Amino acid sequence: MGLNKLKMHSPLRIIAVIDDDDRVRESLHNLLASYGYKAEAFASAELFLASDGPSRSDCIIADIHLRKRQMTGLELLERVRGSQPEVPVIIITGKPSSRPEAFYLDKGANGFFRKPIDGQALIALIDLLLT
């Protein structure tokens, strides 16, 4: 059974997707767009921070393990919490050895998903966080 469309959002809410995997970025971009969100994708935390993304984003989805990058998703979470504590941050990971969900929630994350991501659950959480 496919994803049910929950609702279209107006005005467009901007969701930043930070993941070094092109397929994950594209998949999340398409999922978010199908629910009426505007997704802005970044291959690294550094690219996100160098853009106007931090000031424009209504929610951030960040991979915790960003290969070949200087800043991890955890460091990005800490930076966002220091400068924009009101912006929801959802952490994602594909690593089975990653720390438990409670660790990231204690650090200020608003949600945590393991890949492959349950699209309906992700959209439901974003809807909840942005209402």
How would you label these PLM feature ranges?
Residues K115:
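A Lys-centered signature of the CheY-like receiver
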Residues D21-E40:
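Two-component/phosphorelay signaling modules centered on CheY-like receiver
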Residues M1-A16, D22-R23, H29, E46, ...:
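Non-catalytic signal-transmission and effector/linker regions of two-component phosphorelay proteins
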Residues M71, E75, P96-G111:
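Alpha4 helix (beta4-alpha4-beta5 surface) of REC/receiver domains from two-component response regulators
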Residues H65-R67:
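The short loop immediately C-terminal to the conserved phospho-acceptor aspartate in CheY-like receiver
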Residues E46-A50, T72-P85:
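Short amphipathic alpha-helix used as the core "switch/output" element in two-component signaling
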Residues A41-C59:
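Acidic, metal-coordinating helix/loop segments flanking the phosphotransfer/catalytic sites
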